[in-house]
């Protein structure tokens, strides 16, 4: 009976003695031996609540007890004892509440203990981050939308995420999973209605009917005002929970204890925001705890209670003139319907509108709870709205071109109590991406602080130039410090005041502590603390109501050419661009993997530039360098290096600026980094060198630090501007078998003299991949100068050629064929490689013959000639027939060399810089003879705009590769 009595549910308000008795009994019954670093694997009954007790303070414990009492209220007056399952559910909910307040992930802790109770072994889940993509389309989508189009967007986003992860975030490879949550198209009815209101809707043939007569900004406002909107939010919550439960049951989600991030597009972002806000309040948590769930720290909610008397009381008076939404929340007077015209009474659905008003109030119940606490006896009450809630806690929330700012502005107009201060989504951080020309998007920061309309949004770094970030700080505290004159008291610059703005400096001082708590708790760098300490007094008032510790508005690059497009076409273009944008994907990866705030120790010999982009750039050693490099683009390159296992390892790089190497980087620091363990993704800092007068550095890896057999990415980073050159160091065992391909001779099907892309011979990629699959090392060789490396590598990457070592001539040479022969001979003599097959044109026959290759191993693409018929094998029928012959006969076999060398199979990574090829100043010779197509003629304009370039002279689509540069003799370079 004593045991049953302990399990019985206490009456309301009697939770405190029950929990105190448990604590006392635990302290009495516990043994004298204490193990502070050990924790029981089995958490049963009362012990489950004590998990992590050392992380709580006394105030949290009192709040836990009050929360437990409220969790027990729905169980009745204690007429029946509480079952063990109900008790475990209460304990689980209590533990989740405590974790939310501490900003710890709530999944996995209690669930792991439950698995242990059942005797199931613990499994380590490889998924660390779950990205739930809420895809609702853009505001112009009609009907339910094409499911195949939504699935195609998710597939595109997943493929871009994988490529970027492989290229620059290898440590995250396989640990981030994307799941698709379809959302209803809530704007379809509004779009249909507004389209019928077009003044030219009766005349389809009229030219003006195709103009911009659709008020795009009104569509989301009409959509969220519909009484059916709450059903859409409930549907999204249900679908997200279903996807999450299926994920937990799958092989990728067993034992999952990572973070869950939400990504919402134009329409999905609206639904996701309301779902997050609703999940914070109505069920399970008290209003106080629910508002903390999405806040930065628990102390930030104190100002809400302090100012509610002045802010919300004034909102009661202001809301009298609006639609009768907040009247049901008044305590003093009953609800009175607004006087309406007689013609409106027959079509005005009062019940539906009241239900919708209750839904709006329930979303932000944490704000309006104090205003409505206990209605007067006999007074009207809003109907109960139950939409469910997320089964998971949201870590980061990313918005893609969402009109959420307009929606919140409308709601704040209708319900003045729903100001940015109180409306706090239940997540750690909100990121809102948008293009400045996107008619669907709007800013959010001016809603939280009106003065932010004078602060530009954060520019998302271009992935091609800064794949790991450009070093700018995203912290709100740093932004306030940078623009401190704007936020000083009395410098409002005619900005409208907030409803909850403090009336006097003493009130502002009450917000100082929450702001400091947020800055210190969210940032791991010393710069944020110093910035916060230097912030003005009013900064703490802003940080107390902010949705996270970082900036919220992020602007993506938007080319000026889009101004020529019709406005109604822009939502489709921009919506498609988010799923393909490597800028967005790289930014999300940096935030999710916390690459922005990693502390690097020089003693660990890690890469401060790669792993901590927030570090400031160093000044140039020479004053003239900054002047020389003005308005020129970096054209750095580092040679791929092949070294023998027991031989020297020499890294060579050249750092030039301008399209024709007009400026050399002289006398400046360059960091040399190598990824010694490619699977870990960690860059190791080898050394720092100074460039010579020609912009070159040569670094001989010391013997103690030489690398073993394998392929290692190498990066050379310029200290002054963080530009870099990428290459590979390959350490081979003796006798490694290779296959050589001449890029121009074997791959290019046309000679480009007009600036267009060289065509690829059909089947060429398949033949290269065939040799790679057999284990051979691929060598790409060309007589072109190394200044064209970025362009050639980007062309190979664009056509998915397998990964291999690429070798160029050292500058402009008189006889490129002789240079080829010398280079290959040195590889054979110094690195002890064996060439098993060689491909090229008729000009390469002499090169391969000098190396001693038999005719059976030389494959020439082109028409047979009697002169060379006995010196090579002509592939007159193309690569497709040749590949079939290789697979059918025994001409190709797996390599016989040392099995210690296992080459990674794959294509060229995204470190190639395709924007290098499309810049107009690189194509001066060809622009005068070839006019680009107008934007309207682009068959896939949305794809073309997904990765716009950072310079204004990239407005028109230019060829991705032009090889018509250099001396005239280069037209015949093999």
Curated annotation (Swiss-Prot):
GO terms for biological process: phosphatidylinositol biosynthetic process. One of its GO terms (molecular function) is lipid binding. InterPro entries: DDHD_dom, HAD-like_sf, HAD_sf, LNS2/PITP, PI_transfer. GO terms for cellular component: cell body; cell projection; cytoplasm; cytosol; endomembrane system; membrane. Residues 390-594 form the DDHD domain. Residues 284-304, 323-346, 491-536, 927-974 are annotated as: Disordered. Residues 520-533 have a biased composition (Low complexity). Residues 292-302 have a biased composition (Polar residues). Pfam families: DDHD, LNS2_PITM1-3, PITM1-3. Detected in brain and spleen, and at low levels in ovary. It is found in: Endomembrane system. Catalyzes the transfer of phosphatidylinositol and phosphatidylcholine between membranes (in vitro). Binds calcium ions. It is linked to Cone-rod dystrophy 5: An inherited retinal dystrophy characterized by retinal pigment deposits visible on fundus examination, predominantly in the macular region, and initial loss of cone photoreceptors followed by rod degeneration. This leads to decreased visual acuity and sensitivity in the central visual field, followed by loss of peripheral vision. Severe loss of vision occurs earlier than in retinitis pigmentosa, due to cone photoreceptors degenerating at a higher rate than rod photoreceptors. Belongs to the PtdIns transfer protein family. PI transfer class IIA subfamily. This is Membrane-associated phosphatidylinositol transfer protein 3. It comes from Homo sapiens (Human). The gene is PITPNM3.
């Amino acid at each position: 009976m004593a045991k049953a009595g302990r399990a019985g549910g206490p009456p309301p308000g009697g939770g405190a003695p029950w929990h105190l008795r448990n604590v006392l009994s635990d302290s009495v019954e516990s043994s004298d031996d204490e193990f502070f670093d050990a924790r029981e694997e089995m958490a049963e009954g009362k012990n489950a609540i004590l998990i992590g007790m050392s992380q709580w303070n006394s105030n949290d414990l009192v709040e836990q007890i009050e929360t437990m009492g409220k969790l027990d209220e729905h169980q009745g007056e204690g007429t029946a004892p509480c079952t063990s399952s109900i008790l475990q559910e209460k304990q689980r909910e209590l533990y989740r509440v405590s974790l939310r307040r501490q900003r710890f992930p709530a999944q996995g802790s209690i669930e792991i203990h439950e698995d242990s109770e059942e005797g199931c072994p613990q499994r380590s889940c490889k998924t660390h981050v779950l990205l739930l993509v809420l895809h609702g389309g853009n505001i112009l989508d009609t009907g339910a939308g094409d499911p195949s189009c939504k699935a195609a967007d998710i597939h595109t986003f997943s493929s871009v995420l994988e490529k970027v992860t492989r290229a620059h975030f290898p440590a995250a490879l396989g640990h981030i999973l994307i799941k698709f949550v379809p959302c209803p198209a809530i704007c379809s009815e509004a779009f249909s209605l507004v389209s019928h209101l077009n003044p030219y809707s009766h005349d389809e043939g009229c030219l003006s009917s195709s103009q911009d007569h659709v008020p795009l900004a009104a569509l989301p406002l009409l959509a969220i005002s519909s009484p059916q909107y709450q059903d859409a939010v409930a549907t999204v919550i249900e679908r997200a929970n279903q996807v999450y439960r299926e994920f937990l049951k799958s092989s990728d989600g067993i034992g999952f204890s990572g973070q869950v991030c939400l990504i919402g597009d134009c329409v999905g972002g609206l639904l996701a925001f309301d779902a997050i806000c609703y999940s914070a309040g109505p069920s399970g948590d008290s209003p106080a705890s629910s508002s903390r769930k999405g806040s930065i720290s628990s102390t930030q909610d104190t100002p809400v209670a302090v100012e509610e008397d002045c802010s919300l009381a004034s909102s009661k008076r202001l809301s009298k003139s609006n639609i009768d939404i907040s009247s049901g929340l008044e305590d003093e007077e009953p609800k009175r319907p607004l006087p309406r015209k007689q013609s409106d009474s027959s079509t005005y659905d009062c019940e539906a509108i009241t239900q919708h008003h209750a839904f709006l109030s329930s979303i932000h119940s944490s704000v309006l709870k104090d205003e409505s606490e206990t209605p007067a006896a006999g007074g009207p009450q809003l109907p109960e709205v139950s939409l469910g809630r997320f089964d998971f806690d949201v870590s980061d929330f990313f918005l893609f071109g969402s009109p959420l700012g307009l929606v919140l502005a409308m709601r704040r107009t209708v319900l003045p109590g729903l100001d940015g201060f109180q409306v706090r989504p239940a997540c750690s951080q909100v990121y809102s991406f948008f293009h400045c020309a996107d008619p669907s998007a709007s800013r959010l920061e001016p809603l939280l602080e009106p003065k932010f309309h004078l602060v530009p949004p954060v520019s998302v770094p271009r992935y091609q130039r800064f794949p790991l970030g450009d070093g700018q700080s995203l912290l709100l505290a740093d932004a306030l410090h940078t623009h401190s004159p704007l936020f000083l008291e009395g410098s409002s610059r005619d900005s409208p005041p907030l409803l909850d703005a403090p009336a006097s400096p003493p009130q502002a001082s009450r917000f100082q502590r929450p702001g400091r708590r947020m800055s210190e708790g969210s940032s791991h760098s010393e710069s944020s603390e110093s910035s916060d300490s230097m912030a003005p007094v009013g900064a703490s008032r802003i940080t107390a109501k902010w949705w996270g510790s970082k900036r919220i508005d992020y602007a993506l690059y938007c080319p000026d050419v889009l101004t020529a497009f019709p406005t109604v076409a822009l939502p489709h273009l921009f919506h498609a661009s988010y799923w393909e944008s490597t800028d967005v994907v790289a930014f999300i990866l940096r935030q999710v993997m916390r690459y922005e705030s990693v502390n690097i120790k020089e003693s660990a010999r890690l890469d401060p530039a790669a792993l901590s982009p927030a570090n400031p750039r160093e000044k140039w050693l020479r004053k003239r360098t900054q002047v020389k490099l003005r308005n020129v683009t970096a054209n750095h390159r580092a040679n791929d290096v092949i070294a023998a296992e027991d031989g020297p390892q020499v890294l060579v790089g050249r750092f030039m600026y301008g399209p024709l190497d007009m400026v050399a980087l002289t006398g400046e620091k360059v960091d040399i980094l190598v990824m010694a363990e490619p699977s870990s993704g960690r860059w190791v800092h080898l050394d720092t060198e100074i460039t010579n007068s020609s912009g070159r550095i040569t670094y001989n890896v010391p013997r103690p630090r030489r690398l073993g057999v394998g392929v290692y990415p190498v990066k050379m980073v310029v200290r002054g501007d963080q530009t870099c050159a990428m290459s590979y160091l390959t350490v081979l065992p003796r006798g490694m078998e290779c296959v050589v391909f001449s890029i121009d001779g074997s791959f290019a099907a046309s000679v480009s003299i007009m600036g267009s892309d060289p065509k690829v011979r059909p089947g060429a990629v398949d033949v290269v991949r065939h040799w790679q699959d057999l284990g051979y090392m691929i060598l790409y060789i060309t007589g072109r100068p190394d200044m064209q490396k970025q362009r050639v590598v980007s062309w190979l990457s664009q056509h998915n050629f397998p990964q291999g070592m690429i070798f160029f001539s050292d500058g402009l040479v008189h006889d490129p064929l002789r240079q080829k022969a010398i280079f290959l001979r040195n590889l054979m003599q110094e690195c002890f490689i064996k060439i098993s097959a060689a491909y090229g044109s008729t000009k390469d026959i002499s090169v391969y013959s000098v190396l001693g290759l038999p005719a059976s191993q030389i494959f020439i693409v082109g028409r047979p000639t009697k002169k060379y018929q006995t010196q090579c094998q002509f592939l007159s029928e193309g690569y497709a027939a040749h590949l079939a012959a290789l697979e059918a006969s025994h001409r190709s076999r797996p390599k016989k060399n040392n099995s210690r060398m296992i080459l990674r199979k794959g294509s060229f990574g995204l470190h190639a810089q395709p924007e290098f090829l499309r810049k107009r100043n690189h194509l001066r010779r060809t622009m005068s003879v070839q006019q680009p197509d107008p934007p309207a003629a682009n068959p896939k304009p949305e794809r073309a705009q997904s990765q716009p370039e950072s310079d204004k002279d990239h407005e028109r689509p230019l060829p991705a590769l032009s090889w018509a540069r250099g001396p005239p003799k280069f037209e015949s370079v093999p």
